[in-house]
């Protein structure tokens, strides 16, 4: 987009405000470089990216980005072998710290807001590298000012020796300065440092009383700073140790710089992502400051800005207006009084387009719709009049000529006072001709004018709409309200009357302009009133429609969640019911086999109370279980005496002995004879029965599907596990749950090692999170 357009629309002032919202140099650089895009995909992406972070910013307290600085030059120096100092290493450490804090914050955010998606920020966060090791290396070896003494054993040893030697020097010098005989010879009883050497201040006249080296003197020459001979060698030792310290510090910094170089690419990625995060946060803060909203971009041509206002004007006094190009409208012509807000309306439209295509939230109500323009062209300047020089008209015309050379169907053109600065009749003719030409190009145009001829222009052209800025004749002042679809009207008679002009003069003037002109003015006045009502109603309807869509979407989502939940419950219930039916059927079969075995045993004595007890046990296995719903029933009239049937309620085979009149039959099940409803019987083909073996059963209801071994010692746990697996096999369980807890993992390992060797275990696995996770092992039985 042309820089001239951005300058005219004051986009630099918007950029400066966004830049002020950034915390780091990285964010400020990106804000200063912000320019509008013209590619549809890019524009939509930038807006969505800003909107995602704005949603988070408006609901949460974001991690601090303070202290974030550009590290790219430091990374480059490290890569070529330069040694970074402690301050520079801390800049890299702060970058890593900031990115780690943001990753943690974002992870927690996603856990709290599972139903909300931030796809662009997801991708940004996924790009952030893992730099924990580099952070720890820097963090453990230095603070913000210097290396720690324990950054290496050698450095610790050197600094320890420096400290002990310094203490010895101070002890020696303390004895000298505190000696009674030396009190009058010293300028002050202190120990000081000159040229990195410990010295004492001696009066010049007592120089001969102190053996040593003079390192400095006072400005008056009356005090000499002498290093006594007794500490010269110790000071020399400290100098040597200081050199050793410098070498060791340089070595450590070199190692740390090498580690930075090894992670150079990762550090640059972190810098890029966190710089973008700061830039987006600045956009979000700015958007909140203007109560900005996210517009909807459409690929077809569309401009609808409900209650839009200029973001650089005082929010407390600025008048918001709805700006719209209806579906079939290509040109909007605004008429109205001077200083009535026409130029501000042009700039508002142009600036909002530029802001939106730069990824900034716009100063308008929710529901805005915008096209993406390749270019915005402006001819906006101070108001012109025919008294002004021809050079002013020429400069405007030169600008218009340049615009017409480059404009196309995907351009927005803003003309302020089109055709002004020359003879009114010629200016109006030029304006209409220019608008005709631009309409052929297909550009979207908004123009302001004083010429009354252009009011009629819209009625003679398709795709052209009138608009006007309102003037309040009661207070003789413009209201700055834009009325779309309503041409401006002359208020000369009303203004003159308010100012005290004679009514006779006004009536005579009205008679001179003709009845048609008066009727047109009256019609325009009526249109103004109706237009304001319609606009307010439309904005309210748009709001209600958005709310209805939001509610509809929420209800659809909740209904979908309910359906999924219901389906899950049904699926779980079916699985549990099938398992229960299968187990109950197996249990019943085994009980009947036991009864038959008791009957067939030569020496067995089957008493009536035992049969009743066994039958009661059989009934208990199926209490509350409705198997009939899951089995296809046989028609009643097909069952006859002598048929072999399956009793659906008990899942057992039997033989029909007799059909009764009241839809019941007498059925022999093994040694039990029962009267049952025919509807509970299913006809089976007769088959020779194999002799059954006696099986000792465990009452399944007494065996749980889980075994809790928490708190058991190893031997106790294995014994309990073996006993439980035997009982589970007899209960015909397919899967069982062994609860061993997490702890140290020793019990889990022991259980799984034992399950590997157990003859009745087909396989096993660690529990899912919903089953208890690592604290549970699920075993599948053979």
Curated annotation (Swiss-Prot):
Do you know which Pfam families this protein is assigned to?
MSSS, MutS_V, Smr
Q: Where does ATP bind?
A: 336-343
InterPro entries listed in its UniProt record: DNA_mismatch_repair_MutS_C (IPR000432), DNA_mismatch_repair_MutS_core (IPR007696), DNA_mismatch_repair_MutS_sf (IPR036187), MSSS (IPR046893), MutS (IPR045076), MutS2 (IPR005747), P-loop_NTPase (IPR027417), Smr_dom (IPR002625)
Enzyme category, top tier: hydrolase
Superkingdom of the organism of origin: Bacteria
Q: Which UniProt keywords apply?
A: ATP-binding, DNA-binding, Endonuclease, Hydrolase, Nuclease, Nucleotide-binding, RNA-binding, rRNA-binding
Q: Which family does it belong to?
A: Belongs to the DNA mismatch repair MutS family. MutS2 subfamily.
Complex formation? Homodimer. Binds to stalled ribosomes, contacting rRNA.
Name of the protein described by the UniProt record? Endonuclease MutS2
Query: Lineage from the top down?
Result: Bacteria, Bacillati, Bacillota, Bacilli, Bacillales
């Amino acid at each position: 987009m042309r820089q001239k357009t951005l300058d005219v629309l004051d986009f630099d002032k918007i950029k400066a405000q966004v830049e002020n919202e950034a915390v780091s140099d990285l964010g400020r650089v990106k804000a200063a470089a912000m320019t509008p895009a013209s590619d549809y995909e890019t524009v939509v992406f930038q807006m969505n990216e800003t909107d995602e972070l704005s949603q988070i910013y408006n609901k949460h307290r974001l991690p601090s980005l303070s202290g974030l600085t550009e590290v790219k030059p430091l990374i480059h120096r490290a890569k070529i072998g330069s040694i970074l100092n402690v301050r520079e290493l801390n800049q890299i450490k702060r970058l890593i710290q900031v990115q780690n804090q943001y990753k943690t914050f974002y992870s927690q955010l996603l856990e709290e807001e599972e139903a909300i998606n931030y796809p662009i920020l997801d991708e940004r966060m996924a790009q952030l590298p893992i730099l924990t090791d580099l952070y720890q290396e820097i963090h453990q070896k230095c603070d913000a000012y210097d290396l720690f003494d324990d950054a290496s054993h050698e450095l610790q040893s050197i600094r320890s020796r420096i400290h002990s030697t310094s203490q010895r020097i101070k002890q020696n010098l303390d004895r000298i300065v505190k000696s009674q005989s030396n009190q009058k010879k010293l300028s002050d009883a202190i120990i000081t440092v000159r040229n990195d050497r410990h010295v004492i201040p001696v009066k010049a006249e007592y120089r001969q009383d102190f053996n040593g080296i003079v390192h400095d003197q006072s400005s008056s020459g009356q005090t000499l700073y002498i290093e006594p001979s007794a500490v010269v060698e110790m000071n020399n030792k400290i100098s040597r140790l200081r050199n050793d310290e410098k070498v060791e510090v340089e070595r450590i910094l070199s190692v740390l710089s090498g580690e930075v170089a090894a992670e150079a690419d990762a550090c640059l990625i972190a810098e890029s992502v966190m710089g973008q995060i700061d830039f987006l946060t600045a956009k979000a803060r700015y958007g909140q400051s203007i109560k900005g909203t996210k517009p909807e971009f459409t690929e077809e041509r569309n401009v609808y800005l409900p209650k839009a206002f200029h973001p650089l004007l005082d929010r407390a006094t600025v008048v918001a207006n709805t700006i719209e190009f209806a579906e079939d409208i290509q040109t909007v012509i605004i008429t109205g009084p001077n200083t009535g807000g026409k130029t501000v309306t042009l700039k508002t439209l142009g600036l909002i387009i530029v802001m939106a295509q730069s990824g900034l939230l716009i100063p308008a109500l929710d529901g805005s719709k915008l096209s993406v323009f390749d270019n915005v062209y402006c001819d906006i300047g101070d108001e012109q009049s025919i008294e002004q020089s021809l050079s002013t008209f020429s400069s405007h015309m030169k600008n218009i000529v340049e615009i017409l050379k480059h404009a196309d169907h995907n351009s927005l053109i803003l003309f302020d006072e089109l055709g002004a600065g020359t003879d009114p009749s010629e200016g109006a003719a030029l304006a209409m001709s220019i608008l005709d030409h631009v309409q052929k190009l297909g550009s979207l145009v908004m123009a302001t004018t004083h010429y009354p001829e252009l009011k009629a222009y819209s009625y003679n052209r398709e795709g052209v709409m009138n608009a006007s800025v309102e003037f309040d004749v009661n207070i003789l002042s413009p209201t700055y309200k834009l009325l779309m679809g309503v041409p401006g009207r002359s208020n000369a008679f009303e203004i003159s009357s308010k100012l005290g002009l004679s009514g006779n003069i006004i009536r005579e003037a009205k008679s001179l302009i003709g009845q048609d002109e008066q009727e047109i003015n009256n019609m325009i006045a009526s249109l103004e009133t109706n237009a304001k009502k319609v606009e307010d109603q439309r904005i309210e309807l748009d709001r209600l429609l958005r709310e209805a869509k939001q509610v509809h979407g929420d209800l659809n989502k909740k209904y979908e969640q309910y359906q999924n939940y219901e389906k899950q419950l049904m699926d779980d219930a079916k699985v549990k019911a099938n398992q229960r039916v299968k187990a109950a059927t197996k249990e019943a079969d085994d009980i009947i086999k036991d009864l038959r075995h008791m009957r067939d045993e030569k020496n067995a004595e089957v008493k009536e109370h035992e049969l009743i007890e066994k039958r009661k046990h059989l009934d208990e296995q199926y209490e509350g279980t409705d198997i009939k719903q899951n089995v296809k029933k046989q028609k009643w009239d097909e069952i006859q005496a002598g048929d072999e049937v399956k009793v659906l309620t008990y899942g057992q085979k039997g033989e029909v002995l007799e059909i009764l009149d009241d839809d019941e039959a007498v059925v022999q099940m093994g040694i039990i004879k029962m009267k049952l409803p025919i509807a509970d019987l299913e006809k089976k083909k007769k088959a020779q029965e194999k002799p059954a073996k006696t099986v000792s059963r465990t009452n399944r209801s007494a065996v749980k599907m889980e075994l809790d071994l928490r708190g058991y010692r190893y031997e106790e746990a294995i014994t309990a596990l073996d006993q439980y697996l035997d009982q589970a096999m007899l209960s015909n369980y397919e899967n069982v749950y062994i609860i061993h807890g997490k702890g140290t993992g020793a019990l889990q390992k022991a259980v799984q090692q034992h399950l590997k060797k157990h003859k009745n275990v087909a396989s096993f696995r660690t529990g899912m999170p919903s089953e208890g996770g690592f604290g549970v092992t699920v075993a599948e039985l053979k």
